[in-house]
Amino acid sequence: MDRNQKMDHVIGGKFKLGRKLGSGSFGELYLGINIQTGEEVAVKLEPVKTRHPQLQYESKIYMFLQGGTGVPHLKWFGVEGEYSCMVIDLLGPSLEDLFNYCKRIFSLKSVLMLADQLICRVEYMHSRGFLHRDIKPDNFLMGLGRRANQVYIIDYGLAKKYKDLQTQKHIPYRENKNLTGTARYASVNTHLGIEQSRRDDLESLGYVLMYFLRGSLPWQGLKAGTKKQKYDKISEKKMLTSVETLCKSYPSEFTSYFHYCRSLRFEDKPDYSYLRRLFRDLFIREGYQLDYVFDWTISKYPQIGSSSRPRPTPRPALDPPGPPAERAEKPTVGQDLRGRFTGAIEAFTRRNVSSQGALGDRSRHRSSDDIPSSAKEVHESRNGSTSKRGVISSTRPGSSAEPSENHSSRLFSSGSRHATTQRVPQSYESAAAARPGHEDAIRNFELLTIGSGKKRK
């Protein structure tokens, strides 16, 4: 099927393909239109004859995770001619895109608002028996419309089942495993060849948070002749960089986060509430308002930030309660890309400001374990990630990370809702999804057709 044939083709009887959003070894991603309702969707195509098919496997994981807060709706999956097709909700920009727009630095306030949701997303995946194994900024996207302030976790190409939900049996501890995921954000144990478990997703998330705060990580930009040599250099630098050095000049809660994650044993269930509480208490002590005004809003319209400035509050030296520790570059965006991306940011922000003046506050568990192990083996055998990213897909040339060892495809999930501590009147999750006022803070984001760039080293 050539390009013109694709554009004229109707998927599943009602989704017409629009412009191409991205492509790569995973297949192709298109904007789609529901010809019955006019709704815009994302359509992912994978050639039926591809060497390592994964779209059906991915769609099953997607269906299995349906019902979690922020999990996009899987609208259709099937085969049309020469392609397997998956139709899903359309999402907004990734955190890496927004990070670049904000000149590659996020404020502490934005990082803390994001951290709460990111932990929830990872917890939800874990609660359904799966590890993500490729936690990075590209794999978190903001929503659109009424879910504009909600973070979505995408890309289940490297997801792995770590326990049976019926028997609660955990996968066995193993060593001598190849690095799976993205080297920049991989946990120390992953570098050491140890089978990944829940603790590793959370350690990777910690590196993402420090990347946002610092602007970069100490092991970025290392030169090497081969991929293995580069992984070895990253591993060495990561292990030589103490948590205290990594988090120097930043609140001690980030140091506590890493110490806790690294104290977990292989099969330990993390105390996700404790980790959220670390950052929520810090948020309160800093005097921030939970208004969901992020840096990408303020960077275009500084006056919007006036309502979100921290109120002067006492800052007692608290030692947040928690469980005892059981010890055991992306290149600069090209002018053409930057222009299109900046235009999209400005367009959506302009609409939001005019619609509300100063921005206000705002922002299902299925039981089926029929993910085939054969499909898991297939996508664990893939080598190299070369996909370009549209609104939906995340790993692309020039993405925020070292190339994944295995190719990871683009799909979505998100976390469940959680009650806050007694000091917070409304949960971060419910605030992000429930306030019609500030839903416009990222509302109606123009589609970002991100082209290919150079692969980051």
From Swiss-Prot:
Post-translational modification: Autophosphorylated.
MF terms (GO), sorted A to Z: ATP binding; protein serine kinase activity; protein serine/threonine kinase activity
Annotated positions binding ATP: L21, G22, S23, G24, S25, F26, G27, E28, L29, K44
InterPro entries for this protein: CK1_Ser-Thr_kinase (IPR050235), Kinase-like_dom_sf (IPR011009), Prot_kinase_dom (IPR000719), Protein_kinase_ATP_BS (IPR017441), Ser/Thr_kinase_AS (IPR008271)
Compositionally biased spans, kind Pro residues: 311-324
Compartment annotation: Cytoplasm; Nucleus
Uppermost EC category: transferase
Main location as per UniProt: cytoplasm
Keyword tags: ATP-binding, Cytoplasm, Kinase, Nucleotide-binding, Nucleus, Serine/threonine-protein kinase, Transferase
Single biological process term from Gene Ontology: phosphorylation
A GO CC term attached to the entry: nucleus
Stretches of the chain forming a coiled coil according to its record: none
Biased composition (Polar residues): 383-403, 409-429
Protein kinase domain residues: 15-284
Regulation of this protein's activity per its record: Partially inhibited by N-(2-aminoethyl)-5-chloroisoquinoline-8-sulfonamide (CKI-7).
Superkingdom classification of source: Eukaryota
PANTHER family: CASEIN KINASE-RELATED
Family: Belongs to the protein kinase superfamily. CK1 Ser/Thr protein kinase family. Casein kinase I subfamily.
Name under which the protein is recorded: Casein kinase 1-like protein 11
Organism of this sequence: Arabidopsis thaliana (Mouse-ear cress)
